[in-house]
Amino acid sequence: MFGIFVLSANVGAQEVTSKEIFSIPEPTWIFNSGMSKGKNHDRQDLGFILNENTELRMRQTNAHFKNKLKLRLLGNDKKNEKSIEVGSNWVSIRADEPLVPFIDTPYGEGSAQIEYEVVTSKEMKALPVYKYHGNETMFFSMWDTEDAEYALIQGVDFQLLVPKLDKELVRNLKDFPSIDALIEYHHGIFALFNGIAGFDGSAPENQNGANRYFLKADDSGAGAAYYGGDWTANSEPTTDMWLKELSWATLHEIAHGYQAGFDGQDMYTGEVSNNLFGVQYQYEKYGKKADDIGWLFNLGKKEEVENKLYDKLSRDGDTYHDVDVREQLILLTMFKQKAGNDSFTKIYQEYRKMANQSDFKDWEYTLPNLMNRIYSENSKQDFSAALKKRGLYLDEFQAEKNRVAGYPAVASLADIVSENELVRARQLIDPNYLINSNFELVTNEEIASLGLAGDLTIEILPSDLSNFEGLTVELKDGATIIASQPVQQKMTFKNIPNGVYHLEFSGEQMKYYLPSENYVYVKETQNHASLSLIKADISKLADEDLIFYGFNDQWSGSLRTNLNSREATLTLNMPKPHYLFKDELYVKVTIKSQDGKIRYEKSIYGDIPERFTDDHLLLEIGDSIEIYHAEARNRLKGPENLIDRGQNTNHWLVTEHGLKHLGLNNNPEKDLMIKIEKLGNSLVKAEGIKPMAWERSMAKKQLWTAIQSLSPKDTEHYMSQYYVLFK
């Protein structure tokens, strides 16, 4: 990583100059995971500044190098910058103002060779370049002597193109004693971010890439700053953002490149999850002082931020989807902190490993499910209740795995302690965590010493099961049974310690019924929970998810079927699915009854804002579903045999075995058998669930129900194959 100050010679006029352009290995294992990480940022300067209205001619001369190069003229305003592809034939480029020529670093093994000439009688100014451990005096002497419009600062992880108007800012850095210290500051950011993302060399997919970020100014940039495909920039003519130590924008924009393919999958994280990197950086570096100088609590306005979040979540019943991006960040920070930073890193590493498999399907790995599985299994705590409390959709099978493993459930402090006891609870809990909030996650054991307890009344709502004879319900904290009672229409558990508990029903009849809720919350008050016991007539294995993606392949929404509940859920979680489809229909969902009457219709336009939607719609066997997607070829996703990518409009018939595509004519019963075998084989191998009583296991009930829906011959076959699960 060490270099010296580079004193580039002036480029003479009408001289053909040769230069080798080195290549770097393409880190496909990173890009395959949906992480851009400065993918097209790395570039090589030519050592000079091209004068305004001056022609630069270039060609590539290595016959063994087959790809074209990208030549760019860069400055501090993209509207004035130029670019052109360079092949074996001479090409020309010029600009209306002095700009710096760069060649984008190609990916591959072989180097390229360029020849270029500047068509002018004037000499070009040399580009001052400072590398780590260089000579600052010589660097500024050259910058002053040349009166260069730009200079370049290079580190091992990044390059920073600095305009002349910032020369004195660099000469007299306010937050750093030297340019080396500035480079070390940025290197520290990249080093931590690489560690968070799991680039530790522990496996081939955990190697870091060799490409560098490119940092600059852009007076025509969007917003205050932005991360883009070719660079990341301060949206002003100055690079002052990159020269400050306490620059949240620096952390925020760099971290955008570390967002992976799981981001935004079934929950909005676009301007949120990158900030998890910035939060960890600030709290690791500054400790609790980050409450006052960091972005998480709005630069010292913690009480105001916390009060607003409490009002939304605890008083108004809002979910993750309803609160603003800072509040979403607090919630994600609390999840991450409780699971441990290593659990967050494990999400990255496991996802990269999966994403580099040939049969990988990104839509199958939603962020809520990844968090629930990896956070729970890595920390040996059950995150299911806490995630569902925030309105996130979870795979029921993973939630059961957590419970069977005996993991204690975690909950936000504000969800298990009343407002008038929060101060005392915080005094107990806060010293144990670096980042504190009313919504920090705790186990029941952590608050037990408060001595708080309340009564819990559980009401079984009128449903499919009305005779409760022989049924028992247990209130459990992890593997520990706190209390149990015979099931009645209304039951009260007295003097239960504050906390979150899971319910476990048993009894012969429960082989065929499913509770609508699995978790209950207790505060030091009178607590009430309502749930239904629902007959499992149609297995969850028959359900399908149809996913709508939008601009930049972002998850925009989904239609999920729940055939046992006779409903479909339409979820929309992108305000504008695709802004380029201005005033154009982008997605349309229609549900029709068997006689052709429209039950539901929703039109979604590309650039018209939509509020977060989570609509539960009536869906009966025999109904039809129609989805129009303007980019169905690659942005309507689901099982391969359920999506006709050659048609923008897809039609399905709802059957008891699942969806039948009316164009592709898949066999829903055969599709269901594949799912039966996948679940059945996994349960046979599951040490915790395999010996578990059928009546206590949701997964076994779903498997049994699916098997019973088949033909007598197939039912007999699968009951014999998975007999060990039901004996």
Task: Describe each region flagged by the PLM.
Residues 14-19, 28, 331, 336-430:
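Pan-zinc metallopeptidase signature
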Residues 439-455:
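Beta-strand-rich domain onsets/edges
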Residues 128-159, 528-565, 656-698:
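Compositionally biased low-complexity segments at domain edges in trafficked proteins
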Residues 141, 149-340, 344-361, 371:
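Catalytic cores of extracellular degradative/oxidative enzymes
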Residues 503, 679, 683-725:
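Amphipathic, non-membrane alpha-helical rod segments
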Residues 14-131, 455-644, 654, 660:
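Beta-strand-enriched, solvent-exposed domains that form extended recognition/catalytic surfaces
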Residues 1-6:
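Bacterial N-terminal signal peptides
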Residues 7-14:
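Sec-dependent signal peptide cleavage junction
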